[in-house]
Curated annotation (Swiss-Prot):
A Gene Ontology BP annotation from the UniProt entry: cell division
Cofactor: Mg(2+)
Gene Ontology MF terms in the entry: metal ion binding; phospho-N-acetylmuramoyl-pentapeptide-transferase activity; UDP-N-acetylmuramoyl-L-alanyl-D-glutamyl-meso-2,6-diaminopimelyl-D-alanyl-D-alanine:undecaprenyl-phosphate transferase activity
Entry keyword Flavoprotein: no
Name of the molecule in the record: Phospho-N-acetylmuramoyl-pentapeptide-transferase
Record-linked InterPro entries: Glycosyl_transferase_4, PNAcMuramoyl-5peptid_Trfase, PNAcMuramoyl-5peptid_Trfase_CS
Keyword list, A-Z: Cell cycle, Cell division, Cell inner membrane, Cell membrane, Cell shape, Cell wall biogenesis/degradation, Magnesium, Membrane, Metal-binding, Peptidoglycan synthesis, Transferase, Transmembrane, Transmembrane helix
Role noted for this protein: Catalyzes the initial step of the lipid cycle reactions in the biosynthesis of the cell wall peptidoglycan: transfers peptidoglycan precursor phospho-MurNAc-pentapeptide from UDP-MurNAc-pentapeptide onto the lipid carrier undecaprenyl phosphate, yielding undecaprenyl-pyrophosphoryl-MurNAc-pentapeptide, known as lipid I.
Membrane topology of the entry: Multi-pass membrane protein
Classification via PANTHER family: PHOSPHO-N-ACETYLMURAMOYL-PENTAPEPTIDE-TRANSFERASE, PHOSPHO-N-ACETYLMURAMOYL-PENTAPEPTIDE-TRANSFERASE HOMOLOG
Organism: Synechococcus sp. (strain WH7803)
Stretches that traverse the bilayer: 15-35, 39-59, 84-104, 114-134, 156-176, 178-198, 209-229, 235-255, 263-283, 291-311, 343-363
């Protein structure tokens, strides 16, 4: 038993993170070589460099401001050692991705779309920041009330969707593989609001292990960018470039966020990540690719919903109910089953990479 414990303690996320970063960089350079008009590597490399340096500079400042994460005591006991690790790291890197991504195009329509995506992403970053700050000042693992946070998220999403609707940026159909379309007409608007709320909270739930959300997010942004370039005239190089800038900012952050993490993104980063993914998917008619490629985010969210629903449905007079998972979200289920965090995270990255490849094979034409 002690040998297994010693072996686990020697594991860290250095090599898996290096492999992931190298794979994304390689994919960008290959795409630039093979796909006409592809310039994915430039925003990617710029964002990786800047976010790496800014996070390196910012972590000591977050620590000096006493922005240490409060760890919930009912979670995996191995996480208690992470208490005090600086959080709100999204504040350091989200603006990097947004600014570099916003410089990708100055053409009228594209520039306006990039501005709209940047604003809704930053709005969600601020909402997450308020939530994180509230948690830190109360010294608990909870910040804003769920209803209050959801209301703020919905307000920011509605403002974005109102702008997009006024400009005619969102079609009333969802493009599917094999030249199929799902006509939704006015139903696209409640679906779009649902996508914002569901995706941002799914990325938030995924941010529970060192490097998990940042690695998965970088892969999904890369996948969205690649499928946009593969769609030819139906794609959008400007939005693809924005995606690569966001992928780069999370890869730069991952260098400091991989196990053992020196900093956490907090709701500041995870909510912004989900908002950016949602906005890009809606403006580029990429809801289907996002659904496939973001399968890990979906699974994490569904695991929580199922856990809560089954527990409430089976709760007896003693207040106890059945649990489908050892603990939700899903990554904690594997942890409590004996799989170390240092193994769970690369496995979830690998699943996401597989889903990205599946999404590229089944992207809309």
């Amino acid at each position: 038993m002690s040998d297994a414990s010693d072996q686990t303690s020697r594991l860290d996320g250095r090599w898996p993170a290096a492999i992931l970063i190298g794979a994304v960089i390689s994919a960008a350079f290959v795409a630039d070589r093979l796909i006409p008009n592809s310039l994915l590597s430039l925003p990617l490399m710029a964002a990786i460099l800047v976010s790496t340096l800014i996070t390196w500079w910012g972590v000591p400042r977050l620590r000096a401001l006493k922005m240490g994460q409060v760890i919930r005591t009912e979670g995996p006991q191995g996480h208690l050692s992470k208490s005090g690790t600086p959080t709100m790291g999204g504040l350091l890197v989200v603006p990097v991705g947004v600014i570099i991504g916003g410089l990708v195009s100055s053409e009228g329509r594209s520039a306006q779309q990039l501005l709209a995506i940047a604003l809704v992403t930053l709005a969600y970053m601020v909402i997450g920041g308020v939530d994180d700050w509230s948690s830190l000042t109360k010294r608990t693992n909870t910040g804003l009330t769920p209803r209050g946070k959801l209301l703020l998220q919905a307000t920011a999403a509605v403002l974005f969707l109102g702008w997009a609707g006024w400009q005619g940026w969102i079609a009333g159909t969802v493009s599917l593989p094999f030249n199929l379309d799902l006509p939704l007409h006015w139903l696209i608007w409640p679906l779009a609001l649902f996508v914002f709320l569901a995706e941002s909270n799914a990325t938030n739930l995924t941010d529970g292990l060192d490097g998990l959300a940042s690695g998965c997010g970088a892969l999904v942004f890369t996948g969205l960018a690649l499928q946009l370039m593969l769609r030819g005239n139906a794609g959008d190089p400007a939005l693809a470039g924005f995606c690569m800038a966001m992928a780069g900012c999370w890869l730069g952050f991952l260098i400091h966020n991989r196990n053992p993490a020196k900093v956490f993104m907090g709701d500041t980063g995870s909510l912004a990540m989900g908002a950016a993914l949602s906005a890009v998917a809606l403006l580029s008619d990429s809801l289907w690719p996002l659904l496939l490629m973001g399968g890990v985010f979906l699974a994490e969210s569904v695991s929580v919903i199922v856990q809560v629903w089954v527990f409430k449905a089976t709760k007896g007079a003693d207040g106890q109910g059945r649990r489908v998972f050892r603990m939700a979200p899903l990554h904690h289920h594997f942890e409590l089953g004996g799989t170390p965090e240092q193994v769970v995270v690369p496995l979830f990255w690998l699943v996401t990479a597989g889903l990205v490849m599946l999404g590229l094979g089944l992207h809309p034409r």
